[in-house]
Amino acid sequence: MSSAAEKKPASKAPAEKKPAAKKTSTSVDGKKRSKVRKETYSSYIYKVLKQTHPDTGISQKSMSILNSFVNDIFERIATEASKLAAYNKKSTISAREIQTAVRLILPGELAKHAVSEGTRAVTKYSSSTQA
């Protein structure tokens, strides 16, 4: 085997790999395959951006980072709420578990704002479904 010092450096960067999702090729029996959909928070992030900064855009890389951030926070809250429900011998995660999980995960003032916004959103949803 040759050592690493003898190898030639790569002449160009490797080709970027494209994601294999969203294929519409035909299968063996001639039927079209359904597209694989990847759910993201991109449209919601974009709507919030336009509400706060109407003249500002966002790159795909930034959108990907924010999407990962939202997924991470969602997973942390869900995991903590699940633990809280298990501690209290409950099989259902209620708004109370979510609220407590948010208070445990998010620091100080951020938790207070998140709880108040969450309460406001649940109240708004409840009033719209009853009307």
Curated annotation (Swiss-Prot):
Q: Where the protein is mainly located, per its record? A: nucleus
Fill in the PTM field for this protein.
Answer: Monoubiquitinated by the RAD6/UBC2-BRE1 complex to form H2BK123ub1. H2BK123ub1 gives a specific tag for epigenetic transcriptional activation and is also prerequisite for H3K4me and H3K79me formation. H2BK123ub1 also modulates the formation of double-strand breaks during meiosis and is a prerequisite for DNA-damage checkpoint activation. Deubiquitination is performed by UBP8 in presence of SGF11. Phosphorylated by STE20 to form H2BS10ph during progression through meiotic prophase. May be correlated with chromosome condensation. H2BS10ph is also formed after H(2)O(2) treatment, and is a step leading to apoptosis.
As annotated, the Glycyl lysine isopeptide (Lys-Gly) (interchain with G-Cter in ubiquitin) covalent link is placed at: 124
Point out residues bearing the modification N6,N6-dimethyllysine.
Answer: 38
Segments passing through the bilayer: none
Using the record for this protein, list the coiled-coil segments as residue ranges, or answer none.
none
Any idea which UniProt keywords this protein has?
A: Acetylation, Chromosome, DNA-binding, Isopeptide bond, Methylation, Nucleosome core, Nucleus, Phosphoprotein, Ubl conjugation
* UniProt xrefs under InterPro entries: Histone-fold (IPR009072), Histone_H2A/H2B/H3 (IPR007125), Histone_H2B (IPR000558), HISTONE_H2B_site (IPR055333)
N6-acetyllysine occurs at: 7-8, 12, 17-18, 22-23
Name one cellular component (GO) term: nucleosome
Q: Name one Pfam family in it.
A: Histone
N6-succinyllysine-modified residues are: 35, 47
Which PROSITE patterns does this entry report, sorted A to Z?
Answer: HISTONE_H2B
Q: What is the effect of changing residue 11 to E?
A: Induces apoptotic-like features including chromatin condensation
User: What CDD domains does the record tag this protein with?
Assistant: HFD_H2B
**Keyword field contains Ubl conjugation:** yes
Give the residue ranges for region: Disordered.
Answer: 1-37
Q: Where in the cell is it found?
A: Nucleus; Chromosome
Q: Where is this cross-link: Glycyl lysine isopeptide (Lys-Gly) (interchain with G-Cter in SUMO)?
A: 7-8, 17-18
> Which protein family is it in?
Belongs to the histone H2B family.
Q: What is this protein called?
A: Histone H2B.2
Source organism per UniProt: Saccharomyces cerevisiae (strain ATCC 204508 / S288c)
